[in-house]
Design a protein with these regions (language model features):
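Structural marker of alpha-solenoid helical repeat scaffolds
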Residues: 43, 77-78, 111, 140-143
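Helix-start (N-cap) detector for alpha-helical repeat units in TPR-like alpha-solenoids
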Residues: 48-49, 82-83, 116, 145-146
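Terminal, low-structured helical/coil segments at or just beyond the last alpha-helical repeat
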Residues: 127-163
Length: 163
């Protein structure tokens, strides 16, 4: 039994597995892609690319809690990789967990200071945190709020039309 388990772990990831899963996913058969991903992960638990793709698929399906589990496990198994932290942050942000998103992005950028997507996402998270702070400042405000209102309007415009 131990020998079989050792051989299973030593088996290389088949490129076909990843390609098949990606093809199913792109064709819109996400449920079948997830089943194939689970099978491949069961056979090769450290298959980072397939685990990452599974997290992306779960995120796209708005199954945020499951996506967070997948990306968190990847950050634990491969703490040097920036992409799992970046994608974890995206899911946290979508879930409204901005402080967790900020922490994940900071870790991604410690791992790769030039990671473009993490830098962009960090800006988005900072902007969302600013909107939260400015909105809270308006609650119960009795003073001149024109400058604060302008900031909020501009920030929301950027959030609505980022590109």
């Amino acid at each position: 039994m131990l020998v079989a388990a050792a051989l299973l772990v030593a088996m290389p990831l088949r490129a076909d597995d990843l390609q098949d899963i990606e093809k199913l996913y792109r064709a819109g058969d996400v449920q079948q892609a997830l089943r194939k991903a689970d099978e491949a992960i069961a056979a090769q638990p450290r298959a980072a690319q397939i685990r990452f793709l599974k997290g992306v698929m779960l995120s796209d399906l708005k199954r945020n809690a499951e996506a967070i589990e997948v990306f968190t496990a990847l950050t634990q198994d491969f703490p040097e990789l920036p992409d799992p932290y970046n994608n974890l942050a995206v899911v946290y942000a979508a879930d409204g967990q901005l402080p967790n998103a900020l922490t994940a992005l900071q870790t991604a950028l410690r791992n790769d200071p030039k990671h473009r997507a993490a830098r962009e996402n960090l800006g988005d998270v900072h902007l969302a945190l600013a909107v939260q702070a400015w909105t809270a400042a308006l609650v119960g405000s009795k003073g001149d709020d024109a400058a604060l209102q302008r900031k909020l309007k501009l920030a929301r415009e950027i959030q609505t039309h980022p590109g």
